[in-house]
Amino acid sequence: MGKPTGFLDYTRMDCPARSAEARVADWAPLDLPLSEKNRRRQSGRCMDCGVPFCQAGVTFDGALLGCPLHNLIPEWNNLLWNGNYEGALQRLLKTSPFPEFTARVCPALCEKACVCGRVSQPVTVRENELAIIEYAFENDLMQPMPPAARSDKRIAVVGSGPAGLSAAYYLNRRGHHVTVFERDPLPGGLLTYGIPEMKLPKRIVARRISLLEQEGVVFRTNCCVGRDLSPEALAAEFDLAIFCCGAQQPRPLPFAEAGGVFYALDYLRASAQSLLAQAGPAVTAAGKHVVLVGAGDSASDCVSVALRQNCRSLTQLIRKPRTASTEKRDHAHEEAEAVFGADIRRYETQ
């Protein structure tokens, strides 16, 4: 374990958030890092439980409990507490191909399962993970690791979102020749075009793509399989094709065809294209009265983006009743309240 009495000696300390007023003025990350001393103290709170539910990744009564990747959380928390970043990195990479992504946008199911959270506050697992992987990149510990030998198998991966990149990562490590097809100008899928810049900077995705390329993965961008490349041509060139295209079609809504109505991912994509200076539909909330329908993570992302585009007003319609759970504010609602002086959410609205 970390420090035997760490969970008693240290209280949970999250990364300090920048002020809401400062955040809405730019696209920079939401939080500031802790000092190394405080980060190691946070890892020292891990108790190395006899049954580490944080890494269980099991389904119980229809709900997922713990990390679905089975990350060796107590092990790398202990190594981080002792200042052994390289050892912590090795244990982290044992189960997680892209910690720099999950440490930024994962819902942290590990923390919800943390035993320490039953009597106090859970360990800052997600932020500890981010500290390990960013230390590794900053100190040149993340070096290309191409396979020592290659097979004669050629594999096509269609789609370069999280699933496609994961498939490419593991298949390449096994020595196969992997080519990833992506219809957009840049790889990454929703990592690049769906998650807003302040939550997952584009440079973080590009850094990983560069590492994969150095390890031998080939990316063919601006290539839509079925349009630019026929299935027959794909079958002729490759021994196997894995389709990781994601869910592209939203649920139909009766008012979706009305003017000025956009699905969340279309809006977020347009914002990403604008930041990347890529051609695309000119969709912006600048100077507009904006209404958001829905209450999920995508809705919160749309709130944050609309604020940064200087919308004139913002209202979020939520069909659920107001409860302690639904009323909990995230960073987006803190920002909205800072800008407009009131909660933008309207509950029990159909």
What is each stretch, according to the model?
Residues 156-181, 220-232, 249-250, 267-328:
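Rossmann-like dinucleotide/flavin-binding elements
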Residues 144-158, 169-196:
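Long, low-complexity, intrinsically disordered polar/charged segments
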Residues 177-215, 219, 303-350:
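Rossmann-like dinucleotide-binding cores of NAD(P)H-dependent redox enzymes
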Residues 117-125, 195-207, 221, 225-231:
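Short beta-strand to alpha-helix junction loop
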Residues 236-237:
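Alpha-helix C-terminal capping/helix-to-coil transition sites in glycosyltransferase folds
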Residues 1-154, 202, 241-267, 282-284, ...:
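Ferredoxin-type iron-sulfur electron-transfer modules and their immediate structural context
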